[in-house]
Amino acid sequence: MEIQHYDNDGRGRWFIEADGETLGEMTYFWNSPEVFTIDHTEVGEKLKGTGCGKKLVRAAVDYARQHSLKIRPTCPFAKSVLSAEEFADVLA
């Protein structure tokens, strides 16, 4: 399954779809041109326990690193994943 990214008008999401059904998503909004806040992560029953939630967070980290951005996580799940030392460089 491929993680897709959509950004529009100050908000966006990374998501996983199959057969037109959203199976997991992580949403965010822009605080400034350099910082975005991850405010929600959700994985459907079909993907629970598969690591897809962490893959969504990693997609955001990859995006932040590629574009020299910072992440402010308010979603408890994203906050937990991003507390690892390996992600310190992208935290706002």
What do these predicted regions represent?
Residues 55-70:
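Conserved acyl-CoA
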Residues 13-23:
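Conserved beta-hairpin
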Residues 1-13:
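Active-site rim helix/loop that mediates acceptor-substrate recognition in acyltransferases
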Residues 47, 51-56:
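Conserved acetyl-CoA pyrophosphate-binding loop and the N-cap/start of the following alpha-helix
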Residues 65, 69, 76-92:
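Conserved active-site alpha-helix within GNAT-family acetyltransferase domains
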Residues 35-45:
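Conserved acetyl-CoA binding element of GNAT-fold acetyltransferases
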Residues 21-29, 37:
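Conserved beta-strand in the GNAT
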